[in-house]
């Protein structure tokens, strides 16, 4: 089996299996950073494996076989059996179709990311123009009755809080919520979410992208919760999340404190996992990340090693 075939098999396998296994490992939210890393490892290696496979198919159709295919050439020379024109034509058709699909997906992904960037930058600029500053509140305040607090990437970034949220939160709760939003911006969570959501929009039938985008959004909220708890009491953050829960969606591209997986987050804030569960979950996620990183390399190495052994024997 060629390296391209191994990578193609890897991409298909991970795209099918990861959406079934990773949610089980990340459901508890015990180690959200590792959960995000596992999803990113699955998504990134799947995309890279698919791209390399397509490039390899195109290269084979355009420039012919490389030296690592010496075994097949040897068999053909000995047996007198060569590739039929029909097989060569089929390879060319597959290469053209794969290349066209990859190009189309790349263009759509780029357009989606550019559109998301325009929307968030425009909203950040508009919020700074329309909103106002209040002493003691490290955010732009909008005069709106809805309870909302969110961050928007831009130049510069903006943290937005509504008058309704100010009325619903006391000062310690507000500080904890704003620390949560700053954690999102410091960790570049909005940009990461834009990429995974753009992938999901580009290929909505590929479950690793759609399931990954939803779970990464949930886990990033937990990451921001953990960061905020380093400087604020967990109960203050918990009360702030509950006060903002169910207030409605935030603008496109924004990341809000009380809009994603509030019940799951409230549960982990109120009842943290014990040490044994933390160690177990981290070990499971660490093993998953290592496996996702090692498998494509191992598949490629085995495929190349098998052919190189044959080449060595021939020489």
Task: Give names to the regions the model predicted.
Residues 264-315:
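Pan-zinc metallopeptidase signature
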Residues 18, 22-35, 90, 94, ...:
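Polar-ligand-bearing catalytic/cofactor-coordination segments
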Residues 1-44:
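Membrane-anchoring/interfacial helices and their immediately flanking loops
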Residues 57-70, 304-315:
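Interfacial/capping segments of alpha-helical transmembrane domains
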Residues 40-48, 285-292:
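Select subsegments of transmembrane alpha-helices in polytopic membrane proteins
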Residues 48-62, 72-121:
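Transmembrane alpha-helices and immediately adjacent membrane-cytoplasm interface residues
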Residues 71-85, 160-178, 314:
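Hydrophobic alpha-helical transmembrane segments and immediately flanking/interface helices
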Residues 7-20, 97-106, 288-299:
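Hydrophobic core of alpha-helical transmembrane segments in multi-pass integral membrane proteins
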